[in-house]
Amino acid sequence: MNNTDIKLVSVIIPVYNEEASLPVLLSRVTAACELLPQDYEVILIDDGSHDGSTEIISEAAANSDSKLVGVLLNRNYGQHAAIMAGFETAKGDLVITLDADLQNPPEEIPRLVEAAMQGYDVVGTVRRNRQDSWFRKTASRLINKSMQKATGVHMSDYGCMLRAYRRHIIDAMLCCQERSTFIPILANSFARRTIELEVGHAERAHGESKYGLMHLINLMYDLVTCMTTTPLRLLSIVGSLVAGLGFTFSILLVLMRLVMGADWAADGVFTLFAILFTFVGVQLLGMGLLGEYIGRMYTDVRARPRYFIHQIVRTATPSQQETEQ
């Protein structure tokens, strides 16, 4: 492959309350993209920010010599929905996603482009020497291992959004109409050739992570329920095992009553309650999983848009400027 296969590179950055990081982010992303032999555009998706992020994005995108495009959503839809809005706007032959918190260095962008030019459909990344808390790293490891088992898609770092996708992968993802999706797994399901590169990782310089405990739990549910029906099959297996154990315990309790007498049965009340609570807990867990799937089906059936673009801000073309005059 040569440079003519990738004529335009689109860099998509979802932004949510990143006012403090944006000036440095724009400077570093622009500097990295200027090193590319291809032309480029940088698309900033404002995901319903409440600070000054919207104004910074609009002002930067309106500059006459800017290659920035500002996509302003009417409210917060979440990281992956915002990225899908960027995919819809992007015109590039290669599309790169990047978080706005600067934990993944924009200087890695040329490496991703170079890897894509070698014929890879998706270029993933793995964070080297992660600068996150012990809790975040432990949760990520558990999620990565669980997702590899559940989806069958082997990726080393599901949480790193610094990735590159060829145009046909973007078009395939845009054809998918489900409301909840996880972009890295979805992209890999369409890719023929993939590769993962190790990239640097820095501490968050400004603000707090948007992924708290509840957000990580919601992400786990999103990952599992939007990409695989494995939990439903596991639920059937667990239900069968629990039913078998319950039947075995019932026989055992009857035998113990016959052998040990009624006094022993009275002493076993707490054991019975413990067993009962265990079975009820498994049932409630199963009902919760079924509820997740049914809720997602209901959301998909309503067929509401994933997002609503309030405004797109970009530099006016000469023809547009003449029309305005």
Curated annotation (Swiss-Prot):
EC number of this enzyme: 2.4.2.53
One Gene Ontology cellular component annotation held by this UniProt entry: plasma membrane
Keyword flag Glycosyltransferase: yes
Reactions accelerated catalytically: UDP-4-deoxy-4-formamido-beta-L-arabinose + di-trans,octa-cis-undecaprenyl phosphate = 4-deoxy-4-formamido-alpha-L-arabinopyranosyl di-trans,octa-cis-undecaprenyl phosphate + UDP
One MF term in the entry's GO annotations: undecaprenyl-phosphate 4-deoxy-4-formamido-L-arabinose transferase activity
Pathway listed: Glycolipid biosynthesis; 4-amino-4-deoxy-alpha-L-arabinose undecaprenyl phosphate biosynthesis; 4-amino-4-deoxy-alpha-L-arabinose undecaprenyl phosphate from UDP-4-deoxy-4-formamido-beta-L-arabinose and undecaprenyl phosphate: step 1/2; Bacterial outer membrane biogenesis; lipopolysaccharide biosynthesis
Record has Transmembrane helix as a keyword: yes
Short name of any one Pfam family annotated for the protein: Glycos_transf_2
Membrane topology field: Multi-pass membrane protein
Predominant cellular place of this UniProt entry's protein: membrane
Class of enzymatic activity (EC top level): transferase
Compartment(s): Cell inner membrane
Assigned keywords, A-Z: Antibiotic resistance, Cell inner membrane, Cell membrane, Glycosyltransferase, Lipid A biosynthesis, Lipid biosynthesis, Lipid metabolism, Lipopolysaccharide biosynthesis, Membrane, Transferase, Transmembrane, Transmembrane helix
A single GO BP: lipopolysaccharide biosynthetic process
InterPro entries in the cross-refs: ArnC_tfrase (IPR022857), Glyco_trans_2-like (IPR001173), Glycosyltransferase_2 (IPR050256), Nucleotide-diphossugar_trans (IPR029044)
Taxonomy, superkingdom: Bacteria
Gene3D superfamilies: Spore Coat Polysaccharide Biosynthesis Protein SpsA, Chain A
Annotated TM spans: 234-254, 269-289
Family: Belongs to the glycosyltransferase 2 family.
Function description: Catalyzes the transfer of 4-deoxy-4-formamido-L-arabinose from UDP to undecaprenyl phosphate. The modified arabinose is attached to lipid A and is required for resistance to polymyxin and cationic antimicrobial peptides.
UniProt xrefs under NCBIfam families: PRK10714.1
The protein's name: Undecaprenyl-phosphate 4-deoxy-4-formamido-L-arabinose transferase
Gene responsible for this protein: arnC
